[in-house]
Amino acid sequence: MNSINIAIDGPASSGKSTVAKIIAKNLNYTYLDTGAMYRCATYLALQHGYEAQDVSKILGLLAERPISFGKAEDGSQTVFIGTEEVTLAIRQNDVTNNVSWVSAIPEIREELVNQQRRIAKDGAIIMDGRDIGTVVLPDAELKIFLVASVDERAERRFKENQEKGIESDFETLKSEIAARDYKDSHREVSPLKAAEDAIEFDTTGVSIEGVVTFIQEKAEKIIDMKN
């Protein structure tokens, strides 16, 4: 059976990761969490007190301690930097609030994009991020761009944090998400934008199941056409 690559892009907390993981499981595809890779680079930078001018040092750490993915007993994805599991550590607020400047560094993006492309070359990959359809996998057979209101996205992040035992304030999350949107869409390197051939879908008020069904039907149609 012929497989395809699926690119899902969109702003922070638009539901990309949740949806991508479910579709990957349903189609028996590999889910590649690109956002987690940038969070790993950010986590390393913060751990060592590195700033934007310390690019070569951050790249050195990424080379010494490569990022990899595993599976927990319940089937959920785990993230490692070298041998250290960082699945929860990279979701802390300090990492979230610093990931934009790290991911805007051209050399770091280039290194991680090369890793992502190598993984995707055999197909059957679902990737989500902010520039998958435009930069990482411009030849992906299916490109989706998810959007949702700031209020809805803040609510999702708030619930997510509660479930993980991370303390957060709803109004603070709203302003952080709005600021993140601005930074992501105005950065010089790979700004957040939909690919010209992407299908845009507003998930405000739409259930996760509804979004999954919408994307999976599109994917299955393309897969059928290839067979």
Curated annotation (Swiss-Prot):
UniProt subcellular location: Cytoplasm
Binding positions (ATP): G10, P11, A12, S13, S14, G15, K16, S17, T18
Q: Catalytic activity annotated for this protein?
A: CMP + ATP = CDP + ADP; dCMP + ATP = dCDP + ADP
Q: Which Pfam families match?
A: Cytidylate_kin
Give the residue spans that cross the bilayer.
Answer: none
InterPro entries named among the record's database cross-references: Cytidylate_kin, Cytidylate_kinase_dom, P-loop_NTPase
Biological process GO annotation list?
nucleobase-containing small molecule interconversion; pyrimidine nucleotide metabolic process
**EC code(s) of this entry:** 2.7.4.25
Looking at the record's lineage, which domain of life comes first?
Answer: Bacteria
UniProt keywords (A-Z) are: ATP-binding, Cytoplasm, Kinase, Nucleotide-binding, Transferase
Q: Which GO terms describe its cellular component?
A: cytosol
**EC class name:** transferase
Gene3D superfamilies referenced in this protein's UniProt entry, alphabetically: P-loop containing nucleotide triphosphate hydrolases (3.40.50.300)
As recorded in UniProt, coiled-coil segments are: none
Q: Name one GO molecular function term.
A: dCMP kinase activity
Q: Which family does this protein fall into? A: Belongs to the cytidylate kinase family. Type 1 subfamily.
Protein's name according to its UniProt entry: Cytidylate kinase
Q: Which organism is it from?
A: Streptococcus agalactiae serotype III (strain NEM316)
